[in-house]
UniProtKB/Swiss-Prot annotation:
It catalyses: tRNA(Ala) + L-alanine + ATP = L-alanyl-tRNA(Ala) + AMP + diphosphate. This is Alanine--tRNA ligase. It comes from the Bacteria. The gene is alaS. GO terms for biological process: alanyl-tRNA aminoacylation. It comes from Flavobacterium psychrophilum (strain ATCC 49511 / DSM 21280 / CIP 103535 / JIP02/86).
């Protein structure tokens, strides 16, 4: 049975049980501050478990793209070393939201595995929760009794809280779970050791394939449990492990989920991969196998993340994606001898293999290919640079142990992998101070953790069961009541309060648009005095699990009274102009550059707009002028907003509306039209494009391979921009004595500047030549070394030129020169290569020592190094100390 057939059978089975089949949510989460990525099948349904929304159906099933790089068995650095853990994986899942419970979930799981997939019953073990005195949760007798009717009692295992009580996080819905494990060992192996003893013990052929979670409780901030108002079922089955079991393999990587990718890697690199059936392989072959597993696993995670809108970067989720990709690159570099980008060539295989079920990987194939290629090329350059830096560290090392702090600097600053550092050091006969490296790493983690720690209290619910209504499309002010509040304490923001209202005109951050700001004003009817009314500033608005959260630094004195919610209309007006202009610009870009242009990210705030889009070359100045002119023409056309607030998504798409990849849409959507511009969008817009007034592009540049970014302004910001330009032009005219032709005057100045620069360069050359001829007579011969140390009156750059010239005049030369530029001392050392090789002298070491006297630092190569400092008075002593290196 192929993996495609296995996936289809799962969905078909649960469709026959009355489940609505829904598509996978994007792997990148955009509206859940507690998660960067979809790490489980249930992540997209959290709002239903929390009671903040109503699902399309009480029964749902899907296959969800998931990504994990931390947690139980999911440390990134371990992936590839075993045969059944992954960064990106598919989670087959079926859910019940207050509908069926344990009986149906367990019976259907058993029916599918044993009757449809025909896994032998004697190969299966199940576990149930043994109970917890700590949480006052009893043994799961109900699940035990159901399983007893399906499987021999000696195949039912009692599991502890770690393995058989599933929790969403530190807080939130949770409950006991019942796992199903499969034993894939040979009959001989089973006869020797019981599979029961290997369950949950990291045996590669006795693995969990399905977990049925019975959501009954809510974990509160104080750690206690309370009953949920309804019981839910949340199940997850690892697709790759299921394929391993059904295809008769003992490794996920030997299934047809991975073999096409593995075959492509072996074809590109020439290195062979051996299946898990081959035993007693060499250590070298094992390293090759691990490297190939790492690469084929990681390319899936990276490709799907990019396709869903997450580009590699240096922060947040983007950093995680970059880290995964770089791990794959370094395994290829180290163990498969790949010095050119090659992982990018796997994208076509992945798109062909999975594009039918996940069309985004097919439609975004070119973008994914280009981004990975650029990331590979960049990191391969970093690896080459890191090798040079590591050579420098080794040269400075006294003894045979390299500083862990230095290795961490290579890792942290330059991205040079620590395992590669350790490997190279061993080859050179050195050891790595691992304790020092780990200490530096832990210190950084502690700093990061302390900076990002957030303590969230439980909700205090004032009005139970209320579903918040957003009225912000029609109103900027409305009467409201507070329905719930909670306190959040973080290192970054201090104490904040999250307030939920029964209805709100405040737009929550989403779709690239920032959240509204404004005020809550108490509606105190008992007093006509405005001073008696309390005003609370709302500093931000966000959405979490279908709740609109209003952030404030304080709570009202009386939270049970009525309030008037007032949006800051000035900020909203500016934001709406920028948002509508973004739509007009998107249309213009597609018209001028081509329909390949797709939105890849945006930021819309009151000050400016930022728009990231797919395009594979720089946008020319002429094209930018065309885009600007097109947008301004649409503004001048005074296009009226046409809003379809609750239109079926199919109808909207049929009308030509653009949907954005990586966005999660419901059955009904909001569609925004300005003339030919039609987009699915939930944001705030102007009523007529004339309100935008004017559109001005400020900059255009690259964000990543195949991704460009435009920043632009509208409305009052354009007026301020032109006023500033006018003032600057007036100042320039004043400086130039108010010439009639300002352009001609500036051009004349530029020509004069070029001539003067040439004259200065000639004078400097003559000065350097004169100093060279003077100083050549001041060399001293000491122990067969031609030594010179001197302070000169030159710029730092010219001092280096003179140093090189003097060094080449005599054999065995050792020259130290110093100078002062802008009241800052600089010092430089040249050592002839024959002295570096023959006497072990090192200019880098010299500069580090002499730099102490000028309160500075520096470095370079063994034959040439430079440094800068702060203490001018230390130059004399530094030059005097230089001679000690040759005595």
């Amino acid at each position: 049975m192929t993996s495609k057939e296995i996936r289809q059978q799962y969905l078909k089975f649960f469709e026959s049980k009355g489940h609505l089949i829904v598509p996978s949510a994007p792997i990148v989460l955009k509206d859940d501050p507690t998660l960067m990525f979809n790490n489980s099948g249930m992540a997209q349904f959290k709002e239903y478990f929390l009671g903040n929304g109503t699902p399309k159906s009480p029964r749902i099933a899907d296959t969800q793209k998931c990504l994990r790089v931390s947690g139980k068995h999911n440390d990134l650095e371990d992936v590839g070393f075993d045969t059944y853990h992954h960064t990106m994986f598919e989670m087959l899942g079926n859910w019940s939201f207050g509908d069926y419970f344990k009986k149906e979930a367990i019976n259907w799981a058993w029916e599918l595995l044993t009757e449809v997939y025909k896994i032998p019953k004697q190969n299966l073990y199940v576990s149930v929760f043994e109970g917890s005195k700590e949480d006052n949760v009893p043994f799961d007798q109900e699940a035990w009794d159901i399983w007893k009717g399906l499987i021999d009692e000696d195949r039912i295992i009692l599991g502890n809280k770690k393995d058989n009580f599933w929790e969403m996080g530190d807080q939130g819905p949770c409950g006991p779970c019942s796992e199903i494990h499969v034993d894939l060992r040979t009959p001989e192996e089973k006869a020797q050791v019981s599979g029961k003893s290997l369950v949950n013990n990291d045996h590669p052929q006795v693995v969990e394939i399905w977990n049925n979670v019975f959501m009954e409780f809510n974990r509160k901030a104080d750690g206690s449990l309370e009953k949920l108002p309804a019981q839910h079922v949340d199940t997850g089955m690892g697709f790759e492990r299921l394929c391993m079991a059904l295809q008769g393999k003992t490794s996920n990587y030997d299934t047809d989920v991975f073999t096409p990718l593995i075959e492509k890697v072996t074809q590109i690199t020439g290195y062979k991969y051996t299946s898990n059936e081959v035993k007693n392989i060499s250590e070298e072959q094992n390293k090759t196998n691990i490297a190939i597993r790492v690469i084929v696993d990681h390319v899936r995670a990276v490709a799907f993340a990019i396709a869903d809108g997450q580009l590699p970067s240096n922060t947040g989720a983007g950093y995680v994606i970059r880290r995964i990709l770089r791990r794959a690159i370094r395994y290829g570099f180290t163990f498969l001898d790949t010095k050119e980008p090659f992982i990018t060539k796997l994208v076509a295989v992945l798109a062909s293999q999975m594009g039918e079920f996940f069309p985004e990987i097919k439609s975004q194939q070119q973008l994914v290919t280009n981004v990975i290629r650029e990331e590979e090329a960049s990191f391969l350059r970093t690896l080459e640079q890191g090798l040079q830096l590591l050579d420098k560290v080794v040269a400075e090392t006294k003894g045979k142990e390299v500083s862990g702090a230095k290795a961490f600097e290579l890792y942290d600053t330059f991205g040079f992998p620590i395992d590669l550092t350790a490997l190279i050091l061993r080859e050179k006969g050195y050891e790595l101070d691992e304790a020092g490296f780990n200490a530096a790493m832990q210190e950084q983690k502690n700093r990061s953790r302390a900076a990002s720690e957030v303590f969230t209290e439980d909700w205090s619910v004032l009005i139970p069961g209320n579903i918040e209504t957003f009225v912000g499309y029609d109103k900027t002010e409305n009467d409201v009541k507070i329905t719930r509040i909670r306190k959040v304490n973080s290192k970054k923001d201090g104490i904040l309060y999250q307030i939920v209202l029964d209805n709100t005109p405040f737009y929550p951050e989403g779709g690239g648009q920032v959240g509204d700001k404004g005020t809550l004003v108490s509606a105190n009817d008992s007093s006509d005095s405005e001073q008696a009314k309390q005003t609370i500033d709302i500093i931000d608005t966000k959405k979490e699990n279908n709740l609109i959260l209003h952030f404030a630094k304080q709570l009202p004195e009386n939270i049970e009274t009525g309030f008037v919610a007032k949006v800051n209309t000035n900020l909203r007006a500016s934001t709406s102009k920028n948002h509508s202009a973004t739509h007009l610009m998107h249309l213009a870009l597609r018209s001028i550059l081509g329909t390949h242009v797709e939105q890849k990210g945006s930021l819309v705030n009151p000050d400016y707009l930022r728009f990231d889009f797919s395009h594979f070359s720089k946008v020319s100045d002429d094209q930018l002028r065309q885009v600007e002119a097109s947008v301004n023409a649409q503004i001048e056309a005074q296009l009226q907003l046409t809003e379809h607030r609750n239109i079926p998504i199919k109808e909207a798409l049929d009308k030509g509306a653009m949907a954005l990849f990586g966005e999660k849409y419901g059955d009904n959507v909001r569609m925004i039209e300005f003339g030919e511009s039609k987009e699915l969008c939930g944001g705030i817009h102007v009523k007529n494009t004339a309100q935008i007034w004017h559109f001005k592009i400020l900059s255009e540049g690259a964000v990543a391979a195949g991704i460009r970014r435009i920043e632009a302004i509208t409305g009052d910001a354009v007026k301020a921009f032109y006023t500033n330009q006018e003032n600057t032009l007036s100042e320039i005219k004043e400086v130039l004595k108010k010439p009639q032709d300002i352009l001609k005057s500036v051009t004349s100045l530029q020509d004069d500047n070029v001539k003067l620069k040439k004259q200065i360069e000639q004078l400097l050359k003559e000065k350097i030549e004169g100093l060279k001829n003077t100083l050549v007579s001041e060399f001293q011969e000491i122990n067969g070394i031609n030594f010179l140390s001197k302070q000169v009156d030159l710029s730092m750059s010219s001092t280096k030129d003179l140093l090189q010239a003097l060094g080449s005049l005599k054999p065995n030369s050792f020259v130290v020169l110093a100078s002062i530029e802008e009241n800052m001392p600089n010092i430089h050392c040249y050592i002839a290569k024959e002295l570096v090789a023959g006497k072990g002298l090192n200019a880098n070491v010299v500069i580090k020592e002499l730099g102490k006297y000028i309160e500075g630092n520096g470095g370079g190569q063994p034959f040439f190094a430079s440094g800068k400092g702060k203490n001018v008075s230390g130059i004399k002593e530094a030059l005097q100390k230089a001679i000690e290196f040759v005595k």
